[in-house]
Amino acid sequence: MAVRPIRLFGDPVLRTPAEPVTDFDKELRVLIKDLIETMQDAPGVGLAAPQIGVSLRVFVYDVDGVVGHLVNPSLDLSEEQQDGDEGCLSLPGLSYPLKRAKRAVAKGFNEFGEPVILEGSDLLARCVQHETDHLDGVLFIDRLDPEQRKLAMRAIREAEWAGQTVRVKTSPHPTRGKAL
């Protein structure tokens, strides 16, 4: 297993809808282990396959000490909303307030192709929504209100990583595990 470089804002893979997984094989299991290792090394609470350059519908999470994964997810979201700050390992150092559904039910598969239902609220619900967005080629900054998005784009242009498309970790992530 390996820690893989995390793709940064500007890399086209982050804007491309990921392909469904069709082969539940050893390669998928290695990918999931690499995703978990990379997420924990970053550190973050979630990571989607496109964030390491693999355009497949897979994400991993580590919320409240529970580590897991979901393949080919689909979401059912509550109408009730939650407020919270959100960041992203592909946009290091940036965090903005963003409304998300308070509860989420994600249906998908485990690494062996067996059906899985993942239900959660608060941070887990936020994580599942954020990571599923990655699988659809959507970044959290796309969901910001126009004024916040303008601020985010300015911060991206001024970031030390601006213009790079791959991040190799050199120091702990400034959000201390709060990035998704």
Swiss-Prot record:
Q: Which Pfam families match?
A: Pep_deformylase (PF01327)
GO terms under biological process: co-translational protein modification; translation
Q: Does the keyword Lipid metabolism apply?
A: no
Where is the catalytic site? Answer: 131
Quote the catalytic activity from the record.
N-terminal N-formyl-L-methionyl-[peptide] + H2O = N-terminal L-methionyl-[peptide] + formate
Which molecular function term from Gene Ontology is one that the record holds? Answer: peptide deformylase activity
Instruction: State the EC number(s).
Output: 3.5.1.88
Query: Keyword Metal-binding on this protein?
Result: yes
Q: Which co-factor is required?
A: Fe(2+)
Cofactor comment: Binds 1 Fe(2+) ion.
Residues where Fe cation binds: 88, 130, 134
Q: What class of enzyme is it?
A: hydrolase
**CDD domains cross-referenced by the UniProt entry:** Pep_deformylase
Which keywords fit this entry according to its UniProt record?
Hydrolase, Iron, Metal-binding, Protein biosynthesis
Q: Which family does it belong to?
A: Belongs to the polypeptide deformylase family.
Function statement: Removes the formyl group from the N-terminal Met of newly synthesized proteins. Requires at least a dipeptide for an efficient rate of reaction. N-terminal L-methionine is a prerequisite for activity but the enzyme has broad specificity at other positions.
Q: Which PANTHER family match?
A: PEPTIDE DEFORMYLASE, PEPTIDE DEFORMYLASE, MITOCHONDRIAL
Q: Which HAMAP family match?
A: Pep_deformylase
- The name of this protein is Peptide deformylase
What organism does the UniProt record list as the source? Answer: Acidothermus cellulolyticus (strain ATCC 43068 / DSM 8971 / 11B)
Q: Which gene encodes it?
A: def
